[in-house]
A protein has these predicted regions:
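Conserved "right-hand" nucleotidyltransferase catalytic core of DNA-directed polymerases
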Residues: 3, 7-8, 19-225, 234, ...
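Short, intrinsically disordered, charge-balanced linker/junction segments flanking boundaries
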Residues: 2, 298-301
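Metal-dependent catalytic core segments for phosphate chemistry
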Residues: 243, 250-281
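Short acidic alpha-helix initiation/capping motifs at coil-to-helix transition points
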Residues: 55, 123, 267-269, 295-299
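Short, amphipathic alpha-helical "recognition" segments used to contact nucleic acids or chromatin
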Residues: 63, 287-298
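Short, leucine-enriched amphipathic alpha-helices that occur as contiguous helical runs
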Residues: 54-57, 285-289
Length: 301
């Protein structure tokens, strides 16, 4: 509303009819009308077929959101407990690897000995993790603007030859999986389903975005604990859950615009990502996928 010259205002008391409420309602309608006119104006730059396609996709996505996904709450709770137990076990192991640091304390005035300061290792403290792992030979390749080591999945993997770093990495993975499954359980409605939101054209690239919770981030089956996490999603008795994946949509669109017979033939008869890997001299197929999609979506522009 502010961008279109119609400040929406604010009104919170709807206990009884008032002039302020009426004014708020009128302004709300004016804002909605202004937004509609602006959208109609913006739509003029798109082909009618594009607009129709977006609306058809949104209808399907909305139906998906309404239907929701059945979550096996018993299995999800058991999985949460397993992850939590694993985190506690690793925490205990790390506290044995890194004994408490004891610092003597003395009174500044009397110089009398005070109770020692005891710092028990906390795997949740990135600063403690960095300091303790450095004593075991870890080297940090990235630093924060303030000069402190960046402790994350990437830098821990670089130090995975250090047993203690590998333990911390496993802890963070379990912590992440626990948070994911817990978010599903917290989102379950009375019908036993999770109704995650999908914005069909939410990203600047035109791709979909997901929230409350992000259903697109359910771990892949080949990733650590991915199979267990995916097993939490099910269907009512008597139904079957069918999975499928579209193959190379962006590359098929690229083939359309390139109109190159050789590229199209490779796309349809071979593994295009392996071919790109060889052509670009990359080490792995996933690197080739990252490269081509980064290029197509404008990385480096």
């Amino acid at each position: 509303g502010n961008e279109l010259g119609f400040p929406k205002g604010d009104h919170s008391d709807f206990s009884c009819l008032s002039q302020e409420m009426i004014d708020y309602c009128i302004q709300d309608v004016a804002v909605t009308e202004a937004v509609h006119k602006q959208l109609v104006k913006n739509m003029a730059q798109f082909l009618p077929e594009c607009i129709e396609l977006e609306h058809k996709v949104q209808w399907i996505v909305q139906q998906q959101e309404i239907n929701g996904w059945v979550l096996d709450q018993k299995l999800a709770n058991e999985l949460c407990a397993t992850f939590k137990e694993g985190m506690n076990d690793i925490q205990s192991e790390l506290q044995e690897m890194f004994p408490p640091i004891v610092e003597e304390r003395h009174s500044e005035k009397t110089k009398k000995r005070l109770k020692d300061k005891v710092t028990v290792f906390n795997v949740g403290s990135r600063q403690q993790v960095a300091e303790r792992l450095e004593t075991k030979g870890a080297v940090w390749s990235e630093l924060t603007p303030s000069g402190k080591p960046v402790v994350d999945e990437k830098t821990l993997k670089q130090n995975s030859h250090v047993p203690e770093a590998a333990k911390v990495l496993e802890y963070l993975l379990l912590q992440k999986r626990h948070a994911q499954v817990l978010s599903w359980l917290e989102a379950v409605k009375e019908d036993g389903r999770v109704h995650g939101r999908v914005i069909s054209n939410g990203a600047v690239t035109g791709r979909m975005t997901h929230q409350s919770p992000n259903m697109a981030q359910v771990p892949a089956g080949h990733s650590p604990y991915g199979k267990e996490c995916r097993s939490c999603w099910t269907v009512p008795v008597g139904k079957k859950l069918v999975g499928f994946d579209a193959s190379g949509l962006e590359l098929r669109m690229l083939a359309h615009y390139m109109d190159d017979k050789e590229f199209t033939n490779v796309l349809l008869t071979e593994d295009i990502h392996t071919r790109n890997q060889m052509a670009a001299g990359l080490e792995t197929r996933p690197q080739a996928k990252t490269f081509i999609y980064a290029f197509l979506y404008g990385a480096g522009d």
